[in-house]
Amino acid sequence: LIQDGHVDGKNIHIFEGMKILGGSNDGAGSIKDGFVCRGGRMLNEETYENFWELFDRIPSLDHPGQSVTKEILDFDHLHPTEARARLIDRHGKILDVKSMGFDNNDRLTLGKLMITPESKLDDITIEQWFKDAPHFFTTNFWYMWQTTFAFQKWSSVFELKRYMNRMIFEFPRIETLAGVTRTPYNQFESVILPIKKYLDSHHVNFVTNATVTDIDFKDDDTITVKALYLNKDGKDEKIILNDNDICIMTNACMTDSATLGDYKTPAPKPVEKPISGELWYKVAQKKPNLGNPEPFFGNIKETNWESITVTFKGNKFLKIIEEFSTNIPGSGALMTFKDS
């Protein structure tokens, strides 16, 4: 908007329901209290063209005169990823994963998926697609692809196809994750903070702890927004949009319903409904062709997942992992205990 659309930054307003910016990239904390990273993005040099083009325009916070893109790629090239303990069995043995483990039926079923139009894949799970090829779920490929991109058997085969198309470069190197592009720090500090500072310098208005609770549309066949309903710090507010205003909505977030536990207490079941999901339900009822949030928010057991961020005061654990995997810290990407 600022660079290509020449929009004055002071006319851009970003409403965030949380107290911190970054969405799923909100890794934050302190040495004293520990860190929490609710999510992370697996970057890839070959296929994230829009990301690299954008951040090639954003200055690095640590290296004056250098872009965030160059900072990340330089760091990654100096610290390449090469997992040496990608899959581990129930006996603690590192498995040989040079072979994908496919049989011919697996190959045919996967190949058929790649050439099937997306219009024929609605409401089909991965398990349903491979119902006549159950061996697929015992292959090294499934265990590695599943844990790299957070798939389950009940996930959408539509999404699996899209990941296969988009991440096809990772197919021949999935056993080492050599294609994973690492950021120097966690992605909140390496990605969110630089772009936040850049937008601040252009006087973009960030409003945190502000939940958009509903949207009014024009009474025609467009999806033109005429009003936003906001709850800011517990107070309701209505914002009227002008005819030439642009409204961009985030209709869902993977970490929207996240709750936190601690060393002694499990994360509790969410009490509040997901803010982006609730908004999506409302707008989908008002206008056609805005998607269906039910599969994403109506199947709690299937869409629930747990993530643990560990903050150590020493390096003993890192040394144990390094000795076991032969990877120095940061170079091994993922270790999957396939029978856990």
Feature annotation, model-predicted:
Residues 61-166:
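Rossmann-like flavin
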Residues 32-74:
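Conserved FAD-binding subdomain of flavin-dependent enzymes
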Residues 165-246, 251, 270, 277:
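Helical element adjacent to the flavin cofactor pocket in flavoenzyme catalytic cores
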Residues 11-19, 71-74, 247-249:
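Extended hydrophobic secondary-structure segments that form protein cores and membrane-embedded regions
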Residues 231-330:
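Glycine-rich loop(s) and the adjacent beta-strand/alpha-helix scaffold that form part
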Residues 2-30:
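Glycine-rich FAD pyrophosphate-binding loop
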